[in-house]
């Protein structure tokens, strides 16, 4: 017996497949962001880049973990470069032209992230270091023994 065509239950799946697999367009309109603030937070173990608009609402963000870096690779300058490019990509498409940059932390990825942002074509209005400095507060962690 020859193979017949497969029966599709249109009552269940509708004419064009189940609703689960249909793609609906977003009803949100794309915002134009001429100015914003880029926060670069670097620690000894990770780099996080957050882009906010003028009112402080987060537009885009990325970290070394979300860019699929694991373990000791998260702290490298290359990871910071990829993180900065990943966070800035959607915002450049939305028309970001000028941004304040706020650097926090003393990690290795500070300069790499800053270089990547400058190559992306976004102009800097100011670069500000907002690293919290204690006035003899908590005792720092012990140095690693080798």
Swiss-Prot record:
Q: How does it assemble?
A: Part of the 30S ribosomal subunit.
A Pfam family cross-referenced in the UniProt record is Ribosomal_S11
Annotated S-S bridges: none
Gene Ontology cellular-component annotations: chloroplast; ribonucleoprotein complex; ribosome
Q: Where, per UniProt, does this protein localize? A: Plastid, Chloroplast
- Major subcellular site: plastid
**Mind telling me what this protein is named?**
Small ribosomal subunit protein uS11c
Q: Which GO terms describe its biological process?
A: translation
Q: Where is this region: Disordered?
A: 126-146
Q: Which family does the similarity line name?
A: Belongs to the universal ribosomal protein uS11 family.
The opening ranks of the lineage are: Eukaryota, Viridiplantae, Streptophyta, Embryophyta, Tracheophyta
Give UniProt keywords alphabetically. Chloroplast, Plastid, Ribonucleoprotein, Ribosomal protein, RNA-binding, rRNA-binding
Q: Name the Gene Ontology molecular function terms of this record.
A: rRNA binding; structural constituent of ribosome
């Amino acid at each position: 017996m020859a193979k017949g065509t497969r029966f599709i239950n249109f009552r269940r799946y509708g004419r064009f497949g189940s609703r689960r697999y249909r793609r609906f367009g977003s009803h949100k309109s794309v915002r134009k962001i001429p100015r914003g603030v880029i926060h670069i937070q670097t620690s000894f173990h990770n780099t996080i880049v957050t882009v906010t608009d003028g009112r402080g609402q987060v537009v885009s963000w990325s970290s070394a973990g979300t860019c699929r870096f694991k373990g000791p690779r998260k702290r490298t300058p290359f990871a910071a470069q990829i993180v900065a490019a990943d966070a800035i990509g959607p915002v450049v498409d939305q028309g970001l032209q000028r941004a304040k940059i706020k650097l926090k932390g003393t990690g290795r990825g500070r300069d790499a992230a800053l270089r990547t942002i400058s190559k992306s074509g976004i102009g800097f209005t100011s670069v500000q270091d907002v690293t919290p400095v204690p006035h003899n507060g908590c005792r720092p962690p012990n140095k690693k023994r080798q």
